[in-house]
């Protein structure tokens, strides 16, 4: 059946077995090329590579080969080259359908068997090169992903940019927010396995940010002004997808709690827990309840903290076995312990990561 044709071969998984007389016209032999004649996968082909005979389903064509004229592999590569033409010639309604006549009327150039062998060898040589390139591409993409992770590791442990002893210690930044601030102790978080520079400090998200979540959708409460809002389906890593925006009513008190302004850091509460992006648009928007809004209590480099969330996500420190449980509640987020460098170093780190990531993204785009 068509479902047995997979990845250029024929699989015997989930075959239907019958008993009774066999019409020789429908016998499939080792080396036959089968083609889907109808349906969504019209033109799909696979070589039958078993010694046991099989029977042909009515929606599957069988292209046998006269070995005195054609090599099996030459036939296979020729038919692959005709795939687009076969689809173009197909007819039918909602789904394409290929007749036996379309297949039998295809013109095929037939060189000598010796020349066919050379053609097949040349094709397979170039296919081998292509496979090497594809495998190299996959390997390079893996290296790029690991490199990005390593860059974040270095950044969050204070090893990406040089330490400047003249920088204001991070604790002074925290004391401007709260004169009674005391650094946190990260020792009871077993997954945080790195030390930070002497002029950095361990703090919580609640020490640095004003934190709110959005409004839960409630169709039974129509009070308020209809305003645009975004959900987690609009929020992706470092970007927003705004092609579909919904509206719901917000009261005056809800507007202040749920409004997002340029520069706010937004975090997913559920789904891909911890997924984050900075709202960088010149207009405001509202958020639904499954998004956390973080707004710095003083001047901070929000992009540094965005990359911090990316690092924590990669190391399962949010939404995993570490700092938080599955689903990032307001309490979990408020108490999340983070490394805080000086303000200047926050900007230096974020700029360096932006630069390195942009170069790696350029390489990825060229693959």
Regions picked out by a protein language model, each given a short descriptive name:
Residues 105, 109, 113, 117, ...:
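Non-catalytic DNA-recognition/assembly elements of restriction-modification systems
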Residues 75, 116-119, 305, 313, ...:
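Interdomain signal-transducing alpha-helices
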Residues 1-2, 19-79, 92, 99, ...:
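A short beta-sheet element
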Residues 3-30, 187-191, 206-219, 233-262:
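Sequence-specific dsDNA recognition surfaces
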Residues 12-14, 89-92, 162-168, 185-190, ...:
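Short coil/turn segments at secondary-structure boundaries
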Residues 139-189:
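Extended, domain-scale alpha-helical bundle/helix-rich regions
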Residues 79, 83-87, 309-317, 357:
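Short amphipathic alpha-helical signal-transduction/dimerization elements
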């Amino acid at each position: 059946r068509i479902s047995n044709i997979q990845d250029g071969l024929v699989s015997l998984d989930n075959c239907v077995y019958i008993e009774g007389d066999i019409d020789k016209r429908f016998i499939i032999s080792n080396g036959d090329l089968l083609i889907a004649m109808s349906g969504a996968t019209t033109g799909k082909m696979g070589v039958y590579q078993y010694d046991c005979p099989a029977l042909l389903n009515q929606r599957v064509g069988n292209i046998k080969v006269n070995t005195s004229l054609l090599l099996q592999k030459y036939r296979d590569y020729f038919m692959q080259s005709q795939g687009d033409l076969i689809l173009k010639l197909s007819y039918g309604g909602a789904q394409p359908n290929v007749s036996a006549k379309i297949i039998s009327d295809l013109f095929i150039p037939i060189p000598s068997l010796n020349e066919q062998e050379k053609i097949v060898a040349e094709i397979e040589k170039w296919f081998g090169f292509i496979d090497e390139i594809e495998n190299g591409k996959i390997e390079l993409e893996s290296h790029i992903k690991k490199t990005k992770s390593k860059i974040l590791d270095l950044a969050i442990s204070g090893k990406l940019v040089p330490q400047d002893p003249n920088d204001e210690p991070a604790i002074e930044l925290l004391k401007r927010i709260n004169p009674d601030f005391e650094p946190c102790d990260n020792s009871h978080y077993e997954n945080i396995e790195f030390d930070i520079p002497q002029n950095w400090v361990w703090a919580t998200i609640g020490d640095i940010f004003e934190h709110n979540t959005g409004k839960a959708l409630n169709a039974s409460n129509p009070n308020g002004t209809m305003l645009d809002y975004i959900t987690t389906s609009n929020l992706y890593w470092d970007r927003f997808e705004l092609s579909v925006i919904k509206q719901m009513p917000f009261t005056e008190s809800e507007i202040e709690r749920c409004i997002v302004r340029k520069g706010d850091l937004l975090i997913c509460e559920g789904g891909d827990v911890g997924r984050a992006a900075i709202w960088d648009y010149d207009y405001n928007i509202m958020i639904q309840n499954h998004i956390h809004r973080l707004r710095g209590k003083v001047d901070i480099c929000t992009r540094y903290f965005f990359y911090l969330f990316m690092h924590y996500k990669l190391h399962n420190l949010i939404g995993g076995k570490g700092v938080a449980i599955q689903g990032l509640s307001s309490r979990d987020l408020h108490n999340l312990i983070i490394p805080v460098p000086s303000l200047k170093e926050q900007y230096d780190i974020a700029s360096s990561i932006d630069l390195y990531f942009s170069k790696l993204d350029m390489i990825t785009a060229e693959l």
